[in-house]
């Protein structure tokens, strides 16, 4: 990697994993950098001081006058570019960037890029495993695992990145070999003024890409700008050329490519209709990147999924308990309910938490159609209750332990108790992992 010597003064805004990766990368490029963080003890501060003692660090409330002294700001994804100090710097002509924008300039291997309200971690992990099985030297990261800039140190002939809308806000042009917006549903409405702004941030993933992978079951997956060289599609019951789809016959539901049957959905270890969609998306991305089909199909068959995503915990007294703690928005929970309703029973849904300003109305129909009861926890329990209405019995719980107990009482043999909160976890838990682990422990202790 060549070293770029520049007189540009760069302020890295926000520390943590991403901020530290920017420090490592830009200092290695010979750039004059400083760091600002609104927190007095941000994560990574000790590592920064030990590794780069000469880098100036500004902690506490952002100072517009300080920011005005830099002609480039590299903003961590957790910080809104609408912050007055950042917006003021931009108005004065400073370039506002993020770590993914830096990565795109430096990467010397093709990029597969994945975003979406739901499923992106599963699809990113699947594509990474498929690439390894096909013999590629692949590095996987971005919004999961390793920050993108740190991947550059390891070398690769293919990068697979999960990207959030926050990361894409500060990415000018990614130039991916293949990119997809898996789906769009209300999320992060506490950061965006409306769904359109959130949608537009997601759409930036397609800038400069060579293959757009489009979900035919979600109109918001389609690129607004038609400047890509090729479209590949996926969706249910769409047996068309250049499309990964499904087809039913006497053997079951087939995943198909054009008119060719690839594998039966019953061969998958993953639960739920939404995971069939995730597999189709991964196959389309891998195909666009030139991966051989057979190793991709073998990975699809053996992949068991990720923790806290429609994860089966146990069956007790004829009732399945499912941990979908990663269902942190309404779209994810709707997909989980509709995918996991048992043939001979109903769903008892445990939901609630910090809704991040979301509209819960889309829950009303699937809850009425698929659920026997609703158990609500957390800050926005009342909002969910009002949105869903009186179609099913509702119970309020002050703790997850009480919620599990109430759900068990409401369940009948053949039912599924589903933790899929449609909300973030921070009002009651450290994060969604903590919420899911507590649910698993409680269920295993019944």
Swiss-Prot record:
EC number in record: 6.3.2.9
Signal peptide residues on this chain, from the entry's feature table: none
Q: Where does this one sit in the cell? A: Cytoplasm
* The keyword 4Fe-4S is annotated on this UniProt entry: no
Q: Can you supply one Gene Ontology CC term for this chain's record?
A: cytoplasm
Q: Which domain of life is it from?
A: Bacteria
> What sort of enzyme, by top EC class, is this?
ligase
Q: Which reaction does it catalyse?
A: UDP-N-acetyl-alpha-D-muramoyl-L-alanine + D-glutamate + ATP = UDP-N-acetyl-alpha-D-muramoyl-L-alanyl-D-glutamate + ADP + phosphate + H(+)
Where ATP binds, per the record, is at: 116-122
Gene Ontology molecular-function annotations = ATP binding; UDP-N-acetylmuramoylalanine-D-glutamate ligase activity
Q: In which pathway does it act?
A: Cell wall biogenesis; peptidoglycan biosynthesis
Keywords for this protein:
ATP-binding, Cell cycle, Cell division, Cell shape, Cell wall biogenesis/degradation, Cytoplasm, Ligase, Nucleotide-binding, Peptidoglycan synthesis
An example GO biological process term is:
regulation of cell shape
Q: What does this protein do?
A: Cell wall formation. Catalyzes the addition of glutamate to the nucleotide precursor UDP-N-acetylmuramoyl-L-alanine (UMA).
Q: Which PANTHER family match?
A: UDP-N-ACETYLMURAMOYLALANINE--D-GLUTAMATE LIGASE
Q: Which family does it belong to?
A: Belongs to the MurCDEF family.
Q: What is this protein called?
A: UDP-N-acetylmuramoylalanine--D-glutamate ligase
Q: Which organism is it from?
A: Marinobacter nauticus (strain ATCC 700491 / DSM 11845 / VT8) (Marinobacter aquaeolei)
Q: Which gene encodes it?
A: murD
